[in-house]
Design a protein with these regions (language model features):
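Tryptophan-rich substrate-binding surfaces of secreted polymer-degrading and adhesive proteins
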Residues: 1-144
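Extracellular/virion structural assembly segments
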Residues: 1-24, 131-152, 156-350
């Protein structure tokens, strides 16, 4: 790797029903499994669970009769867990969860009362909004919350505009792949690393998870369809945020930059005993960015435009620690006939 890299900002595309054109993550309940029925390979069925939930399964082979999905892994593959759609005439128990889907809205609500019937989900004394459905959690712009399903996530996205960057944050898996329909672009990145400093650690330390990764060389075709896949073999695949957008170069990232975290945890002392209330933390990054002579006004305009705006930054594709979603902090752009170095602070969101 060289000593410098382009410093880019990415303006994330707004994700809508029209943009997310298909997904392997189930969202609504399906036909219930019946022990007396015979299923073909690819058939989808559900098994009811607690709190108005349903586990969704896919049949792995034909002539599939009387094999209970929950304990027949050679016959059924679990796709995920969903919750029943809210119905005003249904009586819900305390802690039951319902799904409410509207135009570009995919939300879950938890019942706050027993015998909960006929109360709209907008009644905050009866219902608590708990967030997006599992399929749409990766688009809620909250890095800590994850879409989680067994083995694999596949999202098909039709941007309808020029995009050249796909960024995955807080991802858990063995690999991530991005493919584009028009250009034939397809790239897979391994998400497990073994960064060690000596032979002892090489043999005895576990592989570590790469949690943040970007694909910054996607050919920008307006009519291209993107397929984003996270694979994790026989374990859960998870993704905190998926951002797709078009990057813009501000300048050149100079080395070295520094990164740390802002911790939101608190400590409490009771009778001399200190306990921690663990909360989320977020990246805090500081960069020196070389601005080409003559480009200062444009760099200033761009940084002003995206101040107090949520963006993705890519200071380098080689260091995951620099990849972040959040907002610009303090920055300044000096002017010089020979080019100058801008100081840019970035604060990530959780």
């Amino acid at each position: 790797m060289g000593s410098e890299s382009d410093f880019r900002i990415v303006r994330p595309l707004t994700m809508t029903d029209a943009v997310l054109t298909s997904s392997t993550v189930p969202e609504t309940t399906v036909t219930a499994w019946n022990s007396g029925s015979t299923y073909a390979a690819g058939d989808i069925r559900g098994v009811a669970g607690g709190n108005n939930s349903q586990d969704v399964y896919e049949s792995l082979q034909g002539s599939n009769t009387n094999h209970a999905p929950g304990n027949s892994p050679t016959w059924w593959k679990k796709l995920g867990t969903v919750y029943g759609t809210y119905a005003g005439g249904t009586t819900y128990a305390l802690d039951d969860i319902v799904t409410v889907i509207g135009p570009d809205s995919h939300l879950l609500y938890r019942s706050l009362a027993s015998g909960n019937i006929g109360n709209a989900v907008t009644d905050v004394t009866k219902w608590l909004e708990i967030g997006n459905t599992n399929r749409w959690l990766m688009f809620d712009k909250t890095v800590q919350t994850q879409t989680v399903v067994p083995r694999q996530i596949v999202q098909t996205i039709t941007p309808g505009q020029l995009v050249n960057t796909v960024t995955l944050l807080n991802v858990s898996g063995a690999s991530a792949t991005v493919a584009q329909s028009i250009s034939g672009y397809s790239k897979t990145k391994r998400l497990l690393r073994h960064d060690v400093m000596n032979w002892y650690d090489w043999y005895y330390e576990e592989l570590t998870q790469v949690t943040d990764v970007t694909f910054d060389d996607v050919p920008p075709y307006k009519d291209g369809v993107l397929t984003v896949t996270v694979d994790n073999n026989d374990s859960d695949a998870a993704l905190g945020c998926l951002f797709i957008g078009k990057s813009r170069t501000i300048g050149t990232t100079l080395w070295d930059f520094d990164g740390g975290i802002l911790s939101y945890s608190t400590a409490k002392e009771t009778l001399g005993v200190i306990t921690m209330n663990k909360r989320a933390n977020a990246k805090k990054l500081n960069f020196s960015v070389y601005i080409q002579p003559g480009y200062e006004s444009e760099a200033y305009r761009l940084l002003t435009q995206y101040t107090d705006v949520e963006i993705v930054i890519i200071p380098t594709a080689d260091y995951a620690m620099g990849l972040a979603y959040g907002f610009l902090g303090q920055w300044n752009v000096p002017v010089s006939n020979s080019g100058k170095t801008a100081s840019i602070e970035f604060r990530a969101l959780t």
